[in-house]
Structure formats: structure tokens, C-alpha cells
Amino acid sequence: MDAAALAEKWREVVDNPYLRDFPFKLELNEDGKVEFAMSPATNRHSLLQGKLQALLLRCLPHGVQMPECSILTSKGVKVADVVWASDTFFERYRDATPYPKAPELCIEVASPSNTTDELTQKTRLYLEAGAVEVWIVYGDGVVEVYGPEGRRAQSLFGIAVTPLEV
């Protein structure tokens, strides 16, 4: 399925009243099929999302931080738990759903059910879609930072990220 068809399919999913009340994220694979992205969210997962948004707001006051951001990737529409987008990115794509390109920083909060392969694939997909950096955040507050070259010792955004207080 091409990018335009995937984006249209995603908008149909978002607008479908029968799919609105699931307690977990939905994503689309590259064939436009709905996938359940994770097990139902725990309160710890939500707490980490909130702490990450607060951290981004404090450390990167310019730009926009948001939860649950849909991004068109080569493997379908994926939903990052938290993202930060520059003002330039946001002005360009503001209300697009899904975003046709990844915001500069994409963050995944790992769930106990996530496999290493799933997290590695999402990291790769966000970077291929244009993210400058991807963070994987574990339940204990440990943060792994990745760029196109692989794992980084620290964030290029100048944020001391590990470990997060939870």
C-alpha cells in the first residue's frame, strides 16, 4: 500500500467510533491492517509519558511536545508514545494525521510485553522516517538514546536523560 493510501486508511481508523475506546494503541502495518501496538497501558507507562513530556517542556521550551503521535513509516503507521517537534516541523505538518515524516525526537516507553526486536524495529523506522534521535525508556527509568549511527552515550538535544526519576 502506498503512503497516501496508508495515510487515508489511518484517518479512517482515527474517525471510526468503534475503535475509539480501546485501552491500548492501534497502529497500521504496511498493508494497512490494524495491529494492536501494545498491551493495555499501565499507570506506570502513563506516569513515564507524563514525566517525559514535562522533561521536554522544561529542557526544550521551543517546539512542541506531544503524546501518542502517529507517524507514517515504511512499515505502516506507528504511534510514538511521546515526541518533540521543532517549531519548523510543527508549522509545516501541524494537523497532518499521520505525520508524513517523523518529528525530530521520538520516544517509546517500553512495556513489559515489548520484545527487543519490536523496540529495535520501531527505532529504525522512526530514524528512517526522519527522526534525529529515538529514546527507549524502560519501566525503571533507564533511557537508551539512539541516532542513525546507533546507540549514543548522550542525547544530542543536551538533555541528561538517564535515569528518569519514577
Give residue ranges: language-model regions.
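Gly/Pro/Ser/Thr-rich low-complexity, intrinsically disordered segments predominantly at protein N-termini
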Residues: 1-166
